[in-house]
Amino acid sequence: LYTDLRNRRLIWNKETSTLLTPISYHYFEDSAPNPRPLRPVHRVKGRSICLWNGGAAENYFHWMHDVIAPIALASDQGVAINFDDYLLPWSSSQFQTETLQQLGIELRDCLSYLKFNWIDAEEVSFISSTRFGALGCHFSKPAIESLRALWIPESNQSGERLIYITRRDAKTRKVENEEEILSFLEPLGFEAMELASMSVAEQASLFQSCKVVVAPHGAALANLAFASPHCHIIELFPPNWVTSLYANLARTVGCYYLSLI
């Protein structure tokens, strides 16, 4: 994203989520190891807002917590989210469309900057991240509350369901001995759930209804934002990857958390 901002020349690097200023669009052309003509700049008139703070655009977790949660918090704090264009890493997926509509953002006003290398905006605003700390593993409680309020009006309602979130529908990190896990859990009353085909509203309702959630590490646990306080979370990790991301999200909501490797 490039904008003159009245000749002050500001660059937003979408790969590293950093602001670089004052440098010009041609900085990248001149400094490249093998200089080559840059793709044309896409001009955007009026007031725009860039709604992105890092992560993978197509990933459910990053979309919910790096795009939607900051907008929801800003709106709840009285900031008018009313712009001519919304610059997003938008790929028209079902959950992206549903969440934008829930926020009252018209899809016709959304501009996916994934389609352009360079955007020149007359006036552009940025929204701050609501995650902080090392690797963004800590969450703003007000932001989580604003996110919950979009789909869970009564946030303290408790649930009784026991669920296991399967990754059978995932492209990566499948659980090799999942049938063995299910043979242990199902007699205890656990239901195996695939979330990919569910709407955000359905996923939020599901997590609110749970007493215990067992799940391999993955984006589906972004829905812990909708879990009832005192829900028990058991996260399963592979031996080569452990993170405190969902442990901190669970604690922010008020859930009990345990991990197994």
Predicted region positions:
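The feature primarily captures lumenal catalytic ectodomains
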Residues: 1-261
